[in-house]
Amino acid sequence: DHAVWTRMYIIESLNDSNATGPAAARLLQNQVDIGNAIKPVYGDAAGTQLTALLREHILIAVDIIDAVKARNATAQAAAEARWTRNADQIATFLASANPNWPKATLQNLLYTHLSTTKAELVARYTRNYTADVAAWDAVYNHILVMADALSDGILKQHPEKFPGPAVYSQSQVDLQAGMRKLWTDHTVWTRLYIIESLNNSSAAAPAAARLLQNQA
């Protein structure tokens, strides 16, 4: 949801679309959902704090997008510096909650999230839609890596909270993860093609090609 709705917001904002507001609201709700997801493990205060940090992450991203649209390099650089500081704050907070989340590892994960998202924004803004497709794949593949690292850390720290009789082989786990990714790709690229096609956008053809690749 985080990566998908960030992409939707980028597209709608760069198009100055009436859908920008609803996309922003849904993206901000995702930060509440992420905070709520950790409350059963780390408590209400921790969940609320994570939501606040992630909300700032999104609002800074909005500032970066606005600066790119305005071609204001000074404002963009300042916002990107704030984005990095916010990533450091998120890493510090998470590392303090779980020893299986080393701060340096989290920083690397978050910095890659920022860089791949920026590449997506730049490709979209410059209307390099082939690069835009590749950038989105990089964003999405990395967000899965980050999500796995976070969930693995929780499972290692609190195995008692997640009891389960079934023990799956690595091949079974890989199959399940692969199928989820493929069907998520299918849904996301169908939606993106619908948006591009209805807007008569030059991005429709690259989106269609990526959607057809998913079927292969």
Predicted regions and their residues:
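C-terminal amphipathic alpha-helix
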Residues: 1-13, 17-20, 24-27, 31, ...
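Mid-chain, structured segments of secreted extracytoplasmic proteins
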Residues: 28-65, 216
